Each structure stands twice: as structure tokens, then as C-alpha cells.
Amino acid sequence: MVPFMRILGIETSCDETAAAVVERNAEGHCNVLSDVVLSQLDEHSAYGGVVPEIAARAHVEALDELIEQALKRANVSLADVDAIAATSGPGLIGGLLVGLMTGKAIARAAGKPLYAINHLEGHALTARLTHGLSFPYLVLLVSGGHTQLILVRGVGQYERWGTTIDDALGEAFDKTAKLLGLPYPGGPAVERMARDGNADRFDFPRPLVGEARLDFSFSGLKTAVRQAAQDIAPLSDQDVADICASFQRAISRTLKDRIGRGLQRFKREFPATGEKPALVVAGGVAANLELRATLQALCDKNGFRFIAPPLSLCTDNAVMIAWAGLERMATGVAPDTLDVQPRSRWPLDANAETLIGFGKRGAKA
């Protein structure tokens, strides 16, 4: 039986600075002792997106104090912690350096093992923390940097079934919002405007719908939104609402096709898993209610459980990083050495083909 374990988690991959202390008992159950997150929204909102240098500086200024807060709220000291888990990628390299170097320093000073965690693995394993989910299951990761459909076979065993060939879904939301003059972050702003819009007004494209492969594409949709806005400029509030509603509908129908095919593939490959199969949604875009409703209906139709962890655990947080470290410890994975380096790109499925899209970000993890 795996012994009781406690770990300090650190997350600095983008624009949230976070620290958490999490326990895992012998039966595999989780207890979150503390969860501290500091958002950098105010620092980046004026620029309409995350500025890497500003993000890195903010992590430097905040991280030490957040770690102290996490330990204090958990009522533990470093002596009571069994290991350190820090995000090592993928993400913005400046932020990753801050978090990983801090984790290394703590591990060295306190004599604790270090686990360098893939941020995507944190998202992929969160449902085991919140719902005690058994392997295998599917994860749809939708965020500002990633849109991936991942098969989770076990800890450290991941297959990427689909990914974006250009823009991530969260990126498409943010750029659409900026185009329409809406505030950052764009996802919530677009969702709010869409509530009062006519989704039938614009027939936006649904890229890759009908194709057998399970990849995604959103750059063409973004271009169609720009063209529609230019055609009817200047835009009234109702025009903006209608564009947002039509944009969301196109995304919902795209996901319905892409994920629906993924669910069917899962049932073919795992015809009898012993329990109802599950689809987990994670990432900041998972907060979108229309997206959740679409996925819930799709799961109901196909006989799947639909699992959406609490929003605080869908967006970037250190709890999931600590939990991923605990899962790795429990399965006997050796800790990392102190010469481990951060990686701005770090595919969760090391065997997956690198896709080259047409977005500004180049190769997609």
C-alpha cells in the first residue's frame, strides 16, 4: 500500500502565480490543505493579452510570499512536506524559470525530492483528484495555449488523439474579443455578449467538421469573424452580440463533431471498461456554459460521464501540479535531478506527430 504523502506544488507557467499544499492518503484520496493563486489580470489587461516579460517579473515579485502563505494556511513547515512539485513546461519560459528555479532551491535547501511537472499532465489528472476517476478516460483540454483531446491510460501514459493545427480555442476567443473591442480576457466577454445575440445571423465556418482525424482548427473561423465585422462596420452593440453568438455556435458545432468522433473511437477501443466511460473538460475555456452544455448533451447521447472539475481547478493552479507530483510518487516514478530544465514546448504525448499550423505560434505541442 502506498504511504501517506504530502507535497508542495508551484505553478508559474503563464499569468497566474500559485502555490498549494496537498496530501494523498494510503487509499489515494486527496486533501487540499491550501491553495493560493494570484492573478496577473490587472497587469496584462491594458495590452489585450499576456506580456511574457511582465508575467515573469510578477512571478518573481509574488512567488516567495505565496509559498509562505500556502505553508502557513496548511499549518505545516517545509519539514512536514515530503516533496516539491513545480511546473517545468509547457508555457512562457520566463515564468517557468522562476517557478522551477524556486522549486529547485527549496528542494536543495530542505533536502526534499523534486518533481518537474508537465502542466498538461496536471490538467489531465485533475479529475482523479476531484472525482476519483479510474483509467482510462478522455480529456478535452481547452485553454489559451492548447486545444487537445487526450487519452489518459495511466500516470505518464498519454495519447494525443487530436490537437489544433493553428490557434488554440482560448486564443480564438481572445482575438475575437479584441477585434470586437471587448475587454481582456476575451472568453468571458464574448460569452456575456453572446447571451443577447442572434446565433442565426452569421453562418460562420466550422473547420475540419466531417473529417475522420480528430484535430481542430480555429484560424479560419477567426478570419470569418473579422470579415463579417468589416462588412457591417461600424458595429452596434447588437451587431457585436450577434457576432459573438454566431461565433460560439460555430465553436459548439465544431466541438460536437470533433469530440463526438472521439467518443466513438473510445468506445471502439475500450468496449468494456467495467464502468461508464468518461470525458473530462479542463482549461480556462471550460468555464464557458454553452461549451459545457454541448459536451454534456454529447456525453448523454453517447453514454459517457461528463466531468468538469470546479472552475478553480480548471484554470491554472498549483493544486493540480502538487497532485500530479503525488500521483507520480505513488506509482514509483523517480524524482527529477536538480539539473532538470524548463521547456516552453513539452508535448504530453512524446510520440505524437508535431503539427505545423499557420498561426503565429508555429509548431503545436
UniProtKB/Swiss-Prot annotation:
Binds 1 Fe(2+) ion per subunit. InterPro entries: ATPase_NBD, Gcp-like_dom, KAE1/TsaD, TsaD. Keywords: Acyltransferase, Cytoplasm, Iron, Metal-binding, Transferase, tRNA processing. Its EC number is 2.3.1.234. It is found in: Cytoplasm. Fe cation binds at residues 119, 123, 316. One of its GO terms (biological process) is tRNA threonylcarbamoyladenosine modification. Belongs to the KAE1 / TsaD family. This is tRNA N6-adenosine threonylcarbamoyltransferase. The lineage of its organism: Bacteria, Pseudomonadati, Pseudomonadota, Alphaproteobacteria, Hyphomicrobiales.
